Each structure stands twice: as structure tokens, then as C-alpha cells.
Amino acid sequence: PIIEFLPYNEQLLVKLREMKANGAYLVLATATHHTIAEKIAAHLGIFDEVVATSGAVNMAAANKSNCLNQKFGNKQYSYFGNSSDDYAVWDTSKDVHVVNATASVLTKSLSLYDVKTVVERETSFIKTLIKAIRVHQWMKNALIFVPLLASHQLTDPSMLINGVIAFVAFSFCASSVYLLNDMLDIEDDRQHKTKKFRPIAAGNFSLIHAMFLYPIFLGAAVLISFLFLPIEFLMVLAVYYIMTVTYSFGLKKIFSCASLCFLSVIPNSY
């Protein structure tokens, strides 16, 4: 990753800089590989030491807790964490600070510890998910109903139901490609004036979630098409997917022209 364009939590950095100014010894303790962690520490310029994954030791959970206890002693340090892996570290830390955690991690942390600081997520997971899969773009797929309207078949119940199912399948397929596109373009998006605010680029929606949901949305689109629509529609969906993936790999002008021709194929597919 390009270190200077990573999505840093400014609210946390402000607090850490205040602590540093008051004489605190700051350690970047992370499960990230040390080659990346050291570059991050050098870029931020506030950490006195880096404790990170190296070799066969993954510096997370119990490994991180043991390392910090050896360095500073049990209950002799404050720890800022964000995931369920951090419970093992919070168990042995003096002060617990929760940063950018999920609702479940935050709730459990508040029930287990005397939490000193909470830096909450800007938006909920559901809102971030909706933004990541670009639900607002689904309206573009309403074009699928235009041929029904033009052929006066919109009042045909079976055709209308098939149209709605096709709309859902196309929307799920499109969302899978949006996730793929944002994963592939994450470094470029982080350097872009406006795209850096997209959930994945901004770090509000994790790559792990994106990698998990991408095949789910794609699989759902294929399954819906296979179960409820003619095989011709599934073939059309496959062409649509190939075209949109081609778009993701940079052939945007070709895609724009081809998409106009593609719309004329849809009416005969369901």
C-alpha cells in the first residue's frame, strides 16, 4: 500500500499526539507485517517503537498480549484496539480504549471493562454496506422495464414478475462488480479527490468483508436467474458480468458503447 494515502483515523491521531506531547511512550502494536508497520510509524512520526508481525509469529491476540506484558508488565500500559482479537490485550492492560470497533465489539467491551476512550465509527455497518454496494445505482437497472413498457407487456403479471426478478438479479450482479472494482482500484481511489471517500478506500468497509460479499452477491444473482428465469437470461447476465468486469479493468469507453447495444438484447431474455 501507499503509506501516505492510507485512511488514518484523525480523531485518534489527535489524541495520540496529545499523549505524546505529555510525555507518553507510544508503541505501534499491530498484526500487520513489520515492513508495513515500520513505514506507517515513520510516516506518522509519533511512535517510539513498533511491535508487529514478523516471521512465523502473528502479533495478534495472545501473542500481542504476551509481548506487551514482557515489555511493560501486566496492567502497566494503555491499549487502543478495535477487534475481538484485542480482548486478550485489554484483559492485561491498565486502561482500555476502543477505536472504530463494530457494534458488537464495542458493546462487549463496555460490559467487560472500564473503557476510558471510545472513538466510534462514523456510520453503522449496514449504512456502510449499502453505500459500498451502491444501492443508489440499482435504479439504472430499471431500464429493464422499458422494453416491457414499449411492448405493452407491463400489465402482464408473469412478465412483470420476471422483470422484477431480472431487476434484482442485475442489481446483485452489479453490486458484486462494484465491490470487485473498489477492491482493485483501492490504491488509485485513495489518491483521488472524491473517490477516496468510498467505503473501501476510506477504510470504513474492510477488504475482508468485500472479499466475502463479492462472491455472495454474484452467486445470488446467478442462483436467482437459474431458478426463476429462462436460460437465455442467465446467458445475458453472463455477458453483462463480463462487460462490467471489463469496465473494471479499464476499458470504459468500449463498455459505454457496448452497453447501449446490450440493452436491446434484454427484452427477449425473460
Q: Where are each of the predicted segments found?
A:
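Alpha-helical transmembrane segments of multipass membrane proteins
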Residues: F145, L149, G219-F226, I242-T246, ...
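Acidic (Asp/Glu-rich) catalytic motifs at the cytosolic membrane interface
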Residues: F80, C173-A201
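Interhelical loop and helix-boundary elements at the membrane-water interface
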Residues: S124-K140, P199-A210, T246-S264
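Alpha-helical transmembrane segments of integral membrane proteins
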Residues: K127, M139-L143, S158-A169, H209-L213, ...
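Multi-pass membrane catalytic core of lipid/isoprenoid biosynthesis enzymes
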Residues: K193-L234
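Membrane-embedded alpha-helical segments that form the functional core of polytopic membrane enzymes
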Residues: V146, D156-L184, E232-T246
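C-terminal cap/substrate-recognition subdomain and adjoining C-terminal extension
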Residues: E4-L154
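Membrane-interfacial amphipathic/re-entrant helices at transmembrane-helix boundaries
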Residues: H152-F167, G219, L223-P230, K252
